[in-house]
Structure formats: structure tokens, C-alpha cells
Amino acid sequence: MEPVSILIIATAAFFAGIINALAGGGSFLTLPALVFTGVPPVAANATGTAALLPGYLASAWAYRDLIRAPAGLSVLAVVVIGAVGGAAGALLLLATSDQAFRAIVPWLLLFATVLFAFGPRLHGFLARRAKRGHGFWGRVGVLAVCGYGGYFNGGMGIVMLAMFRLLGVHDLNVANGLKNLLSAVLTVIAVAVFMVGGAISWPELPPMALAAVLGGFAGARIGRRLPSNVLRNGIVLVGAITTVIFFVELFG
């Protein structure tokens, strides 16, 4: 791998670690960086997910004392269903050709960018309509969201927070704890599936994982100084630019 390629993917992973520690959205950077350096789209998605796994594990551990299951569910049920969903999403990715995934990616990025842009309003809307005790629909929601996360990491955190709001989790810290737990669980399972399926590009993984961890530590410090609206607007801008680039490549 060329030194320039290492610099590009490590830089992307570092900033992905920062924004994942603050608000999520690291895939907006890691996926295009890997594709730009010549990694096929499916392998790029799998490798980027694997590189960000240490950050998910650290976040889950940091929030371990705030994890509370939604009404009608247990923490064990959330973990098991999340693992099944993550595995299903990862298997679906492995069954997707590079050509098909290249056509899907712009739409996934667009979806994730819109979620980021309207995330606060969506959470407020759902909080006013949230109900408690929907065990069956809670399980369906966890399965669907984790399936999405196993297939494509982008915007996963926003989708999870919205789901937990809808299930009656009004405390944002508790919702974040559940989000971090589910993100870690489904990503561990998804990465295991990617490894068995041979989807990970190993030369790119070590520098990206190290850079993402360093970015996570930096993000924890930056988060105390950077206004959340500035961060969110920046992520939306990056997502919009990335989405346009992928659409131009698809239809250009």
C-alpha cells in the first residue's frame, strides 16, 4: 500500500473517530476514503466498520452503568436480537455484489445525511408520541435497526436513538447507553461475519483502527469545547458533499 493511501485512510479514520465519539457519522469519511484508495465498495464498507469497532466497544463500556432496557424488553433480549440483526445485515452485505452496492451507497448516504440533518426534530417528534410497553414492536425495531447497522454503519446511531425515543426511552443518557451497547454488539458480530466471508481488506485495517482510537480520545476532549450545532452542521456538510460525489460517480 502506498504511503499516500495510508495517509488518506488514517486521516479519515482519525476524524471518523472524533465525530463518532461526539455524534456518530464516521462512515461518511471512512467509506469514501477507502473507495478512493482503490478498495472495492463492499470491502471498503466492511473494513471501515471493523476499523471503528474499538470505538464502539469503548463507548459501550463507558456507558455501562446507564444501560436500561426499554419497557417490554430485557437487556439480554436487546443484545440477542441486536446480534441476530447485525449478523443478518452483514450476511446481506456479503451477498451484495460490488456493482450493486456501488449503486446503493449514494442512497444510503443520502438517507443517513437527512437523518443527521433532521435528527433533533425527529427525536422531538417521536418523544411527543412515544408509548411504553410495546415489547413485540420493540423487538422488531431492534432487529430492523441492527440489520441496517450490520449492512451499513452510516447514520446507525441516529436511527437507534429515534427508535428508543419511540419506545419510550426519554432519558437521552439512557438512550445513548442502549445505542452504544447495540452498536458494539452488532458490530462485533458483523465484523466476525466479514472476517469469515473474507470481506475485510487487512492491509488498511491496522492504521485505520489505530487512527480511529486516537480520534476517539481527541473527540472526548473536543466535545467539551465544540458547540453541538457546529459539529452537527459540519457532519451534515461532509455527508452532503460525499453523497453528491457518489451520485455523480453513479450517474455521471
Predicted segments with their positions:
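Selected transmembrane alpha-helices and immediately adjacent juxtamembrane segments
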Residues: 1-40, 127-176, 182-183, 206
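Structural signature of hydrophobic alpha-helical transmembrane segments
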Residues: 5, 39-54, 100-109, 147-155, ...
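Residues within membrane-spanning alpha-helices of integral membrane proteins
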Residues: 6, 49, 105-109, 113, ...
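Selective hydrophobic functional segments
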Residues: 47-100, 187-230, 234
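Transmembrane helix exit motif
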Residues: 58-67, 107-131, 241-252
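Hydrophobic alpha-helical transmembrane segments in multi-pass integral membrane proteins
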Residues: 88-89, 144-154, 190-198, 242-252
